[in-house]
Amino acid sequence: MFLSDEIPILANLPVDREYADIYFLHDIHFGSELFDEKKWETLKSAILSDENSYICIVGDVFENAIPNSKSDMFSQTHSPAEQKDWAIQQLKDLSHKILEVVSGNHESNRTTKVCGLFPLYDCCLIAGIGEKYRETIAFIDIAVGRYRGNSHKQMHYFGQIQHKAKDLRSYHSSDYTDGIDFFASGHDHEAKDKPRAKLVFDKHNKVIYKRNVECINCGSFCKFGGYGSKNAYRPQSDKMYRLRLYGNEKRMETTGFYL
């Protein structure tokens, strides 16, 4: 069975990397008639060609429309079984780039809820990355580069990754985990870079300081239409984000881009 969410993922990247670019990929929805194959293939190719690029997968890899789900089974371009085959191949192709995988509602609220199976975990197992899967929340420690040239010490960044998140004016899901540097979520298809901050008491030095947390949602790989337009939802931006983690000093940069 898959590892508990409470077991953090330790991702030790090569020490010769000056930085690592992290892409949070989610709401891909392969099998949906709205799946944007060109967008997916363009980004996949760019990531594979860049040694500094890595991936965190944040759920809803496939559409997985089944009886009694909100999605339309009859408009799917591939059956759920074919969608799993596609996901397995993508995970295999990107296995050396993937740092973690969490499931989304199109996996856990459908197949898992109806029959107790975990389709995305199955895909990870077959692709040889089962240890990187977490069912709901992934806590990940990413080590990159050499801290100030010290070959024995890497720069570490701690993150929390989950498909759904609360994002209110005075509260965010990132608030309930101390010590994180970044938080990534998806689900609502709304691309946004919305950093948060909290005050922290340093009990050793007896001072209060502000800790910044990068909070990122990378939208989706869906075109407009279908369920969204039928329910009067507005079109969502195609913008995506990459999080750059530097290896020689504790510094993060979130950059937006279009494909």
Q: Model-flagged regions — what are they?
A:
Residues 8-132:
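Core catalytic region of metal-dependent phosphoesterases/phosphodiesterases
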Residues 12-23, 139-159, 210-213:
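Beta-strand-turn-beta hairpins that frame and shape the catalytic cleft
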Residues 24-27, 54-60, 98-105, 133, ...:
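Active-site neighborhood of phospho(di)ester-bond hydrolases with catalytic His/Asp-centered motifs
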Residues 158-252:
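Conserved beta-sheet core of the metallophosphoesterase superfamily
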